[in-house]
Regions:
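Interdomain helical connector at the RecA1-RecA2 junction of SF1/SF2 helicase-like NTPases
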Residues: 1-80
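Residue-level signal for alpha-helix termini/capping positions
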Residues: 16, 76, 101, 127, ...
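Conserved phosphate-coordination/catalytic loops
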Residues: 57-65, 87, 116-117, 134
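Short, acidic/turn-prone active-site loops that include or flank metal/cofactor-
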Residues: 112-115, 157-161
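Conserved SF2 helicase motif VI
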Residues: 159-174
C-alpha cells in the first residue's frame, strides 16, 4: 500500500464493534524467581526458562499446581473449556500436558515440529471437546483460526506486545 496503512483498529474498538468478544483477564502470580536468569536476545534465555519450568522439581510442580488451582477457581465449568496454553519449550509443553492430564484435565501438546495432520487432529479433538487444552510452543501465535477457543493460558513471559496480542487474540474470536 505504498507505506500507507489501509485500516487500523485497536483492541477496545474491535470489541466495541463486536469484531472480537469481550474478555476477562486474570493475572496469577507465581513464586518463581526469574531474577537470576540470563537475558538473551531481548528476553529471558529460553533454555533457562524451560529448565526452571520443567526440571526444577518442587518449583515446577508448585507452579503447575498453581495454574491448575487458578484455572479451577476462575473457570465456571472446566468441561466447557477449549483452551490454548502458550509454553516456552517442547519440554515445557509436554510437562504442562502431562501435569494437566494427571489432574483430570484432558490435554495434548503440539510444537513447531508437529506435522500438519497432527495439528489438524488436535484442533478437531479440541473443538469436539475430547481435550480441554492444547499446549503449544512456537505455533498458534498467528495463522490459526479456532473460534471455539475460550481460554488462553500465558505460561511463559514475553517482552513482545505483538506476540502477547497475537496469543490473546486466539481466544477473542466470535
Amino acid at each position: 500500500f505504498h507505506n500507507r496503512i489501509a485500516a487500523e483498529i485497536r483492541l477496545p474498538e474491535a470489541i466495541d464493534r463486536k469484531l472480537l468478544c469481550p474478555f476477562q483477564y486474570f493475572g496469577v502470580t507465581d513464586t518463581v524467581d526469574l531474577d537470576q536468569l540470563r537475558w538473551s536476545r531481548g528476553g529471558y534465555d529460553k533454555g533457562e526458562l524451560s529448565k526452571i519450568y520443567t526440571l526444577s522439581g518442587a518449583i515446577a510442580d508448585r507452579r503447575a499446581d498453581l495454574v491448575v488451582r487458578a484455572l479451577l477457581k476462575y473457570i465456571t465449568d472446566i468441561d466447557e473449556v477449549k483452551g490454548l496454553g502458550f509454553c516456552v519449550s517442547i519440554e515445557h509443553a509436554a510437562f504442562m500436558c502431562r501435569y494437566f492430564n494427571e489432574h483430570g484435565i484432558p490435554s495434548i501438546y503440539l510444537t513447531g515440529q508437529s506435522p500438519d495432520v497432527e495439528r489438524s487432529a488436535a484442533k478437531q479433538r479440541l473443538v469436539a471437546g475430547e481435550v480441554r487444552f492444547i499446549f503449544v510452543v512456537d505455533i498458534y501465535n498467528e495463522g490459526v483460526d479456532i473460534p471455539e477457543v475460550n481460554t488462553v493460558l500465558f505460561l511463559r513471559p514475553t517482552e513482545s506486545l505483538t506476540i502477547f496480542l497475537q496469543q490473546l487474540g486466539r481466544g477473542l474470536r466470535l
